[in-house]
């Protein structure tokens, strides 16, 4: 059973094949008109792509990928619940926020220290889920500064952790190439 905050930060390796990750990156890179550049003075700074919007638009490039991604996150949410014996304490009804790809393209792209629940609109979030789609040459860690913990981005690695204020984190700059991240949040219904 978990006894400290770090225990609730869970990493699984090889949750998807490299080909699956490469396919998502290729689809992302082939649809530049639907990219959204976010630049709030590195809080955050990256390029974002909303997979769920493309799915809802019935884009054939994303239909099966969205379903596969959803099944992946459902499966690992169940593992998270089981590992920490959260059954009776875990929300009985929840949903996933839209699935998004984030590309940290250059050494200036990053997401400085933040928490994922900031206001009324984000207060439904309770668990963060990331899948790293590539392994940058250097850097790109998800850093938890108050917990003295860095999670290295590795192709096919999943990271889950609570979304609240105790889990302040940052997306460190990737050096020598981009970092691609697939992410979502679990939300209360």
Regions from the PLM with identified roles:
Residues 1-158, 166-189:
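Fe(II)/2-oxoglutarate oxygenase catalytic core
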């Amino acid at each position: 059973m978990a006894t400290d905050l770090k225990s609730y930060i869970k990493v699984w390796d090889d949750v998807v094949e490299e080909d699956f990750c490469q396919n998502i990156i290729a689809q992302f890179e082939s649809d530049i008109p639907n990219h959204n550049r976010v630049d709030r003075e590195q809080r955050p700074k990256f390029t974002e792509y909303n997979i769920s919007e493309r799915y809802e638009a019935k884009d054939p490039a994303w239909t099966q990928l969205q379903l596969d991604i959803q099944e992946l996150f459902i499966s690992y949410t169940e593992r998270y619940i089981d590992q920490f014996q959260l059954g009776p304490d875990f929300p009985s009804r929840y949903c996933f926020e839209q699935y998004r790809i984030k590309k940290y393209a250059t050494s200036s792209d990053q997401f400085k220290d933040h928490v994922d629940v900031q206001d009324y609109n984000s207060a439904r979030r309770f668990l963060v889920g990331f899948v790293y789609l590539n392994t940058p040459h250097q850097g790109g860690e998800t850093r938890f500064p108050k917990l003295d913990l860095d999670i290295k981005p590795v192709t096919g690695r999943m990271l889950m952790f609570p979304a609240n204020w105790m889990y302040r984190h940052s997306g460190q700059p990737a050096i020598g190439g981009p970092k691609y991240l697939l992410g979502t949040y679990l939300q209360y219904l």
